[in-house]
Structure formats: structure tokens, C-alpha cells
Amino acid sequence: MLDLKNLQNNFDEVAKKLKNKKVDENILKKLAELFASLKKEKIALEEFQAFQNKFSKELATAEDKESLKAKLSENKSKINEQSAKVNALENELEEIAHAIPNIPDECVPVGEDENENVELKKVLNPPSFDFTPKEHFELGESLNWLDFMRGVKISQSRFCVLKNEGALLSRALVNYMIDFNRSRGFEFVNVPFLVNGATMFGTGQLPKFKEDMYKVDDEDLYLISTSEIPVTNLYSGEILASETLPIKMTCYSACFRKEAGSAGRDTRGIIRQHQFEKVELVSITKPEQSDSVFNEMLECASDLLSSLGLAHRHLMLCTGDLGFSAAKTVDLEVWLPGQNKYREISSVSNCRDFQARRAKIRYKNEQGKNELVHTLNGSSLAVGRTLVAIMENYQDKEGKIHIPDVLKKYF
């Protein structure tokens, strides 16, 4: 959640940045009106309280005590009424603020959508083939690695069954990713895939993205859309010791998304599924540590792709494509020869204190004061899309898939 004091004190500046992040101008106008109303009603409340304080002290020596008592009683009623007005405005303001995204960093390019993201660099060269490379779903079906028909039969569309070497390769990737991330100093944690509403709120999924979540009927439980949610919230409501930071974690999980708004996109294959697997990086840092840890996380995910021999590129997301909780995001896109283009395989984001304010994660700074931490997250990597990338990049003209050397010991 945004710092409401900063929003109120620097409204025009912050509102401009939020417009770049596609926040509706009517919402910003409503916020401005609420801030003005709240200021007015608080002044009135303070005047009533000042009256009460002043004349309560004079009651003992007043000549007409009964008259003053009546005035104080009447004023007390006004204080209660005015307090209710202030509380109602504060609640309305906070409710709207819950759906306002994070402010983009100054380094984030202003842009409307993904077409205005900025390429930072390319890593490795895409492979060349003396034949037309196939897409992963063709290879997967011919090798009996991917069973779409039975996935749909037992579930619905956008579900798939992995079989034989395809399932083994997926498992090998998970183990390799965890080991790689641990070698870079990230502690492995294993968390529940079902979390409560407060946890979903803490990282920004609720209330704005409720319609994209799978919820358990009659229970305050949701299936996670990313392990960023439970891992970040491991420290919700806590005050951490300064010397424990940064905390760097990696986690494997299944992820569940309704993919609302994705109709017609990636309808074939396993690029976009309702259930998929991911190995995540999550860090909790002091404010002054978050930029360097962001670079560590980005380097970790990029080096992981390089270790698998997968060509990829770094993209700085523009304001219009930036996620709800992120102040800055760099996407990694892997080369898929079957599609003849780069596709997203990782997003590394610095959320600054946005999630920490919602989840109430603080640390005791050097001055002994409680201060909000910064939170960061990133995929290292999306397992299904890495499987897709290996299938397409390591295929031969006979339709066989060769396994990267670093994965062979995991079979």
C-alpha cells in the first residue's frame, strides 16, 4: 500500500506517476476530494477537542458549573459525531488506497503497454537449425511427453499431464533450480499452497485481483498464484532485527491462476496454464540494500538460464506494463525457436516498502526505530516455460530432445 501521508503531501507529483501506471483519473480525483474533506473535518474535530480540554480545566473554578457542564456535554456529543465523520472518511480513503498500485521508480520508462518495454541486453546467441524447428506441443505429443487430451478430460482446458521423460525433465529442472539458487545464497523454504485472505492482501493480490484467484468455498483460503505470496508473508506482522537482513529465500510451488483476460492467447501447449510450477526468489531487505539485492536476484535468474545454454534477453518494463505491487521490474525472455521469438520466463521486481506496509513487516533500524523493510521477488525460473525452452532449443531433426549437461545427474 502507498504511504498515504506522502500521497497527501505530494499529491500532484504522485498522481502523475500513478497516471503513467494507468490509474483511473476519476479515482485520483476522488482521492483528492477525500483528502480535502478529511483535512477539513479533522480541523473541526481538533477545535471541538480544544474547547473540551480548555473548559474541562476551568470547571472546578467556574461560577456557573451547571451551565458549563451542559456546554461540555453538548460539545462531547459533537466530538463523538465529528470523530465518526473522520473515521468514516479515513476508512473510505484506506479502502480506495488498497486498490492503488505502487509508484514506479524514476528509472522506469514511461509507456503504454508491453510494446514500449526497453531491451537492456541480450545474453547468448539463439541456436541455428538446418531444419524448421517444431513447437514444444508438437514435440511433446510425438514423444508422449505431453498429454493434453487427458489433462482436459480430468480437469478442463489449460491443463496438461506430463509423462515419461517430460515429467522426469520437469522434476530435474525443479531440483536443479533449487540447488542453483541455494548456491547463490538463497535459503530453501517449503510453504503451503493455500493461504488466507490476509496473506493475499499482504502482497497485493487482494482485493484488486480477487476474480483471478481460486478460492475455497466457505473458507478463508485461496490457492496461491505464486509462492511470492506465502514466502513474503512469512514475516508479516513482525519486527526483524537489523542484523538478520537481508533475508534471501527460494521456494518451489505449484501456482494456480484463472488467467482471466487471456482468452485466445497461447491456447496450444503449456505456455499459459491454470496450474503451473515455479521456483521463486524472495528477499526482505533494509531500504538501502534493495537495489543491490535486486541485481543479485536478476543475475541469479539470468545465470541460471545461461547455465542451461538458453539464449535470453533482459527487458525493463515500462510504467504501463508494470505489475500492481512493483516499483521496478526487469523481465527475462527466453528464445523459443519453434515460435521464432522471445517469451517471458522470469520477472524480477523490487516492491520497495509497498508490500511491507500492507503486511506490516518492519525492522529495528540503527537508531532503534521501527522502519518498513523492502521486499523483492523473482522467478528463477518458471518450470514449465523452461521445459518448453529446452524442448525447442535442444531438438534435432529426428524430433528427439537432447538434455543439457548440467541436468544429466538429476536423471
From Swiss-Prot:
Binding-site positions, ATP: 257-259, 344-347
Documented EC number(s): 6.1.1.11
Binding site for L-serine: 226-228, 280, 379
EC main group: ligase
Compartment(s) of residence: Cytoplasm
Superkingdom of origin organism: Bacteria
Gene Ontology, cellular component aspect: cytoplasm
Keyword set, alphabetical order: Aminoacyl-tRNA synthetase, ATP-binding, Cytoplasm, Ligase, Nucleotide-binding, Protein biosynthesis
Gene Ontology terms describing biological process: selenocysteine biosynthetic process; seryl-tRNA aminoacylation
PANTHER family tied to this protein: SERINE--TRNA LIGASE (PTHR43697:SF1), SERYL-TRNA SYNTHETASE (PTHR43697)
Official protein name in the record: Serine--tRNA ligase
Organism phylogeny: Bacteria, Pseudomonadati, Campylobacterota, Epsilonproteobacteria, Campylobacterales
